[in-house]
Amino acid sequence: MKKLLAITVFAVMAMTAGAQSLNKMTWFNEPASYDIKGNTLVMDVPGHCDYWRISHYGFTVDDAPFYYATYGGEFEAKVKISGDYKVRFDQAGLMIRIDKENWLKAGIEYVDGKYNLSTVVTHHTSDWSVIALNRPVDHVWIKAVRRLDAIEIFYSFDDKTYTMMRNCWMQDNTPVQVGLATACPDGEGFKAKFEGFQVKHLPDQRRLEWLKAHADN
């Protein structure tokens, strides 16, 4: 009984949450203009930048802004996103990245005058999936949950009800960069806003299962 109680306490203590301090994060492809106030980042997204590898279009680009912190283990990351999207493929979202050949990005992408919930998953080559929205939205929350060797991506319009938009593989037991990404492949730039970015550590699922299996030993 005491060991089962200890397992419960361990799990609760491990699920710590809090806003990630934006001032302690790192830029990859730092934009010329941005502003951080509290837990809000407003970015002037530069034009003609993107993340994509090979498939369909035949080119590789890795030159868009990404503001991140590095995390190991299992976690839940969440952020509120809005943007003044202007031209085709303007986008803002959450990015999880191991290296230039292994990453995902998920958020809002503006395509042919419509808002889309967009996810690109890359393992050497990129794929792209979208959920078309029937109306413009002022903002969206994107949440990513990393468990074992998978990442689940969810969206919400009220930060209460979340719907899954993608489940994909990502190498486990490997530190990843988690943060805020934008892209503007076709245009001259736009303004994007990120609010309330937070990462909650989750107790390692394999360790919890081991503890339960050995609770009476």
Annotate each language-model stretch with its function.
Residues Q20-N217:
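Extracellular glycan-recognition regions
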Residues M1-S21:
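Bacterial Sec-dependent N-terminal signal peptides
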